[in-house]
Amino acid sequence: MSRYVINVTQYDDMQDLLCAADILITDFSSVSTEFAVQRKPCFLYAPDYDSYDRGLYLTPDQMPFMFAETEGKLLCNIRTFDESKYTVAVDKYWNFLGIKEKGTACQAVFNEMNKMLWHHTQE
């Protein structure tokens, strides 16, 4: 295995791994959407796509991730990855899904709580 690839199969907390990873290669798991919150590169690899019988909520062309059914196509997708196009595609994906997260939720909650507390002390 490459020194750039670490086998983390036995690691318990996937969320820690998503934060630590530089890129993600997955199939049609919902982990792709969770990972995309960080705007880090995510690639779909599904060599069994034609026989995928569980059904999908979205098709690969509805997602912002480059899709491959072969290792060769996956490597090509990684080599030709364009971060600016990916960022635009992820923003469109969030809009399509109705996600409004901008990375400022904690600040917005703090501001609202501060206004409520300030208003309460003025009464």
Residue ranges and their predicted role:
Residues 16, 72-73, 108:
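An acidic, carboxylate-rich microenvironment
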Residues 6-9, 66, 98-101:
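Pocket-edge positions in alpha/beta enzyme catalytic cores
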Residues 1, 30-98:
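Catalytic binding pocket for nucleotide-activated donors in carbohydrate/polymer assembly enzymes
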Residues 1-33:
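Donor nucleotide-activated moiety binding/catalytic core segment of transferases
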Residues 102-123:
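C-terminal alpha-helical cap of glycosyltransferases
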Residues 12, 69, 104:
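Residue-level signal for the nucleotide or nucleotide-sugar donor/cofactor binding architecture
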Residues 20-23, 80, 115:
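Residues within well-ordered alpha-helical secondary structure of globular protein domains
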